[in-house]
């Protein structure tokens, strides 16, 4: 039952979801008008659409190579827009005879797998090729730093160029990296992986889940055969004196290598696209893919002459070198929102794991507006290359409100970078990150309690979800919970108490942390269950949400203090005693006789009648009953089922004036006595929250009023 309830209570407490719809509409309008300003579309004879004057909120990060246009100038010549695009040309020239070679038998099989079935999204071939290009440039950069004389054409800038051609249906990706010699081309492109292709095939046969083992072999380049019918590669090694070569293949089993002139240092890949993949010759589509997967690659990526990746990867920078404005704009880029984050966590470590991360915690969330459950807000990178957007498992589901980036070189990835091979490692990384975020929030709560209390009013539901669904973190999360208590003077959202604060204010003789579930503060302060604690100045936490009692029940203990409902029998350490006001009116025989009479005449609701000294102002009270919140959750689990209120053990204050007078009426006026005892019992049920519809009391109350007035 508890597991079922856990699924239901996560959606409780959302009665006011739509109260801010006007604000939401306003924000959406603001987002639309702020993000896109001054769009002008120009059509030339070739139906080329150019968007001029795009202004982004992230202007600090975005730059443009487009010539400056005066704001009042509404016209721009189509020819000028075309000239702004710099296309990569195939200017190389082959010399000599081609050498035709065959792929290894195993490599042919693997090539078919890669081209046809490995990747779930074809578009990732661009990510793979950019990642390879970045690696190649990094190699030549490192060599140039350590031994510049070993690098050919050291003055060539480190950059990745991409060119689209819709007329010829081609896509070209060129880098100024380390390049390849002829032997390296045969070694790297003629066979797959250094771990042994036969072993690779063997593992594929043993494991039906190709993605689980294929990451052990380097086959990223071959992803371009998913979209291309012919692949041409011009390459020249960075080693001084190296020759240039052309590698060409249609992926059917063989390839050719030919010496070529006019080849620049690095590698140029020309993909002649299949008809089913012509969309990758369109600039807009390729640009979106670059921004999706490779926005933070460490080297410039120019698409048709314009740099695309102009956003700084803040998680790689020194936290002290980043301004507040940069953080704000980076957060808005990640979250696609326009609020200011409440908190941020910039965390890096090299031991025991390599982690570079930055997290932002928003100031508001959309679930409360009825927008549906949010998706994970953290993206996973490896060396600044996107592995998974909205990554599952990096943070637990209850932390889905967090926005950010995690970059780790320790993550072993499959070749397509779409499945993680080592879930155990991901869990270790997740554990480190969750612990760091919770610690940061706890520190913030202590440094600025008022700000944190406002934050928890907005996001407290997510942390309560975490306690219910993620037992591992319940102790850490419980430190962040905030509740109103009997010590507060008002119902202010900033006048909340943590469990740690509660414990620090406990009486020396107090053993437990006490809570009371009530609809509101006024009901709590007037509750007969609170009365004995009020008399002894014992603080009681008030819970107003149905989920809160379930949350504290799951927490169980805070340190060595048990969390107890004041309505339970365990709360008897602070039972009020009315001995001082006690009058010796009733003998024990009279008490026993009265309790026996109650058990008989009220048997439809009372299983046992007992005497108590727990309450002073109320004639009767129910202890250890099924809570009203629990009953509400049962109804959510089984909405069509009738849940009858079970009989209860009712405890009577035998010194209360009503009870003293009622004892006398049991024999002299049994009709009135029956009406009174039924009302006293029902009042106890109401105080316990066990009666939701009080209308059945009305006829009885009318009878009592009539009897009173006819005397």
Curated annotation (Swiss-Prot):
Cellular compartments per GO CC: cell cortex; cytoskeleton; mitochondrial inner membrane; nucleolus; spore wall
Subcellular location per the Swiss-Prot or TrEMBL entry: Cytoplasm, Cell cortex; Cytoplasm, Cytoskeleton; Mitochondrion; Spore, Perispore
The UniProt record lists the keyword rRNA processing: no
Transit peptide feature, positions: 1-62
Gene3D superfamilies: 3.30.230.80, 3.40.50.11260, Heat shock protein 90, C-terminal domain, Histidine kinase-like ATPase, C-terminal domain
Family: Belongs to the heat shock protein 90 family.
Function, in words: Chaperone that expresses an ATPase activity.
Name of the protein in its database record: TNF receptor-associated protein 1 homolog, mitochondrial
């Amino acid at each position: 039952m508890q597991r079922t309830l856990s699924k239901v209570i996560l959606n409780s407490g959302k009665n006011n979801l739509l109260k801010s719809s006007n604000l939401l509409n306003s924000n959406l309008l603001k987002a639309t008008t702020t993000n896109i300003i001054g769009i002008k579309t120009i059509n030339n004879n070739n139906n080329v659409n150019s968007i001029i004057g795009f202004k982004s909120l992230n202007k600090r990060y975005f730059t443009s190579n487009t010539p400056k246009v005066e704001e009042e100038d509404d016209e721009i010549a189509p020819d000028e827009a075309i000239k702004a695009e710099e296309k990569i040309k195939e200017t190389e020239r082959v010399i000599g005879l081609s050498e035709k070679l065959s792929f290894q038998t195993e490599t042919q099989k693997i090539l078919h797998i890669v081209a046809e079935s490995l990747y779930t999204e074809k578009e990732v071939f661009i990510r793979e090729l950019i990642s390879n290009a970045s690696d190649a440039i990094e190699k030549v950069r490192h060599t140039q730093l350590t031994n510049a004389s070993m690098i050919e054409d050291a003055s060539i800038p480190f950059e990745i160029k991409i060119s689209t051609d819709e007329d010829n249906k081609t896509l070209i990706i060129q880098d100024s990296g380390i390049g390849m010699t002829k032997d390296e081309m045969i070694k790297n492109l003629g066979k797959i992986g250094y771990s042994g292709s036969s072993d690779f095939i063997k593992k594929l046969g043993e494991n039906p889940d190709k993605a689980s083992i294929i990451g052990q072999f380097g086959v990223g380049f071959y992803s371009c055969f998913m979209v291309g019918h012919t692949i041409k590669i011009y390459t020249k090694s960075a080693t001084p004196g190296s020759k240039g070569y052309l590698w060409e293949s249609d992926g059917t089993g063989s390839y050719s290598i030919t010496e070529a002139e006019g080849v620049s240092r690095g590698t140029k890949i020309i993909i002649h696209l299949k008809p089913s993949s012509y969309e990758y010759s369109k600039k807009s589509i390729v640009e979106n893919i670059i921004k999706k997967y490779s926005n933070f690659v460490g080297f410039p990526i120019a698409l048709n002459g314009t740099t695309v990746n102009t956003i700084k990867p803040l998680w790689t920078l020194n936290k002290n070198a980043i301004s507040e404005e940069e953080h704000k704009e980076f957060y808005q880029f990640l979250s696609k929102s326009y609020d200011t984050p409440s908190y941020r966590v910039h965390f890096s470590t090299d031991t025991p794991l390599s982690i570079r991360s930055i997290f932002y915690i928003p100031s508001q969330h959309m679930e409360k507006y009825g927008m549906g459950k949010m998706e994970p807000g953290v993206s996973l990178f490896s060396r600044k290359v996107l592995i998974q957007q909205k990554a599952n498992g990096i943070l637990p589901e209850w932390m889905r409100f967090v926005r950010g980036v995690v970059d780790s070189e320790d993550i072993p990835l499959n070749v397509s970078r779409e499945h993680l091979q080592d879930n155990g490692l991901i869990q270790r990384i997740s554990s480190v990150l969750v612990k760091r975020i919770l610690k940061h929030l706890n520190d913030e709560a202590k440094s600025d309690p008022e700000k944190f209390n406002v934050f928890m009013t907005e996001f407290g539901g997510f942390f309560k979800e975490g306690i219910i669904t993620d037992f591992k973190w319940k102790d850490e999360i419980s430190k962040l919970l905030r509740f109103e208590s009997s010590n507060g003077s008002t119902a202010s959202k900033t006048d909340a108490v943590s469990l740690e604060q509660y414990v620090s204010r406990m009486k020396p003789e107090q053993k437990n942390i006490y809570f009371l579930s009530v609809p509101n503060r006024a009901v709590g302060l007037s509750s007969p269950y609170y009365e004995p604690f009020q008399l002894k100045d014992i603080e009681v936490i008030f819970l107003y949400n149905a989920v809160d009692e379930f949350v504290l029940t799951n927490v169980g203990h805070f340190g060595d203090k048990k969390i107890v409902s004041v309505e339970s029998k365990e709360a008897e350490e602070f039972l009020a005693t009315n001995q001082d006001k006690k009058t010796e009116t009733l003998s024990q025989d009279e008490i026993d006789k009265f309790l026996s009479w109650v058990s008989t005449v009220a048997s439809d609701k009372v299983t046992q009648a007992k005497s108590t000294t727990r309450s002073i102002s109320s004639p009767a009270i129910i202890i250890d009953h099924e809570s009203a919140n629990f009953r509400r959750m049962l109804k959510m689990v089984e909405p069509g089922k009738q849940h009858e209120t079970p009989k209860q053990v009712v405890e009577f204050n035998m010194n209360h004036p009503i009870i003293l007078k009622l004892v006398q009426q049991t024999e002299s006026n049994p009709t009135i006595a029956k009406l009174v005892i039924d009302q006293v019992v029902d009042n106890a049920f109401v105080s316990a929250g066990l009666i939701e519809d009080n209308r059945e009391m009305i006829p009885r109350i009318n009878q009592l009023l009539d009897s009173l007035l006819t005397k």
